[in-house]
A protein has these predicted regions:
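Divalent-cation
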Residues: 2-139
Length: 139
């Protein structure tokens, strides 16, 4: 099936740059995906915010400022703490760990889990990439 130039231009115009950036960041083979996969395999869950820290710090309550170079192993280690992990906008640094994110509670969310509801609200409020990784249980 071939597309005309106009159809391709229309498809490109409808693409959400934020979604494309998120997909690019978590694509298989990327360091971020490796770190996420480690958390998934450990079944521990996590909440990762990728943003310019200065733009989202108003949401922080507590936490530990790290400002260290990103590695999949370090992401996995800090995910063992209960709070959110904040990565720099380009995901090259682990800026903060064990952060409680406090988004606007009036932002509508259909999510039922606390982690996923927080992720949705933070993303809507800040237009940042937020990744919620479910904790797995053998039930």
């Amino acid at each position: 099936m071939s597309h005309s130039g106009d159809e391709l231009n229309e498809l490109e115009a409808r693409q959400d740059p934020r979604l494309l950036r998120a997909l690019d960041a978590v694509a298989p083979g990327t360091p971020l995906r490796e770190g996420i996969d480690n958390i998934v395999h450990a079944r521990s869950g996590g909440l990762i915010l990728i943003a310019d820290v200065e733009d989202v710090s108003f949401l922080f309550s507590g936490g530990i400022k790290l400002d260290i170079d990103y590695s999949p192993a370090l992401l996995y280690q800090v995910a063992k703490m209960d709070g959110a992990i904040v990565l720099s906008a380009d995901a090259s640094k682990i800026a903060w760990a064990n952060v409680q994110l406090m988004p606007d509670p009036t932002i509508l969310s259909m999510e039922t889990g606390t982690r996923h509801r927080t992720a949705e609200r933070v993303s809507k409020q800040t237009k940042s990439i937020v990744i919620a990784i479910s904790q797995r249980r053998d039930v």
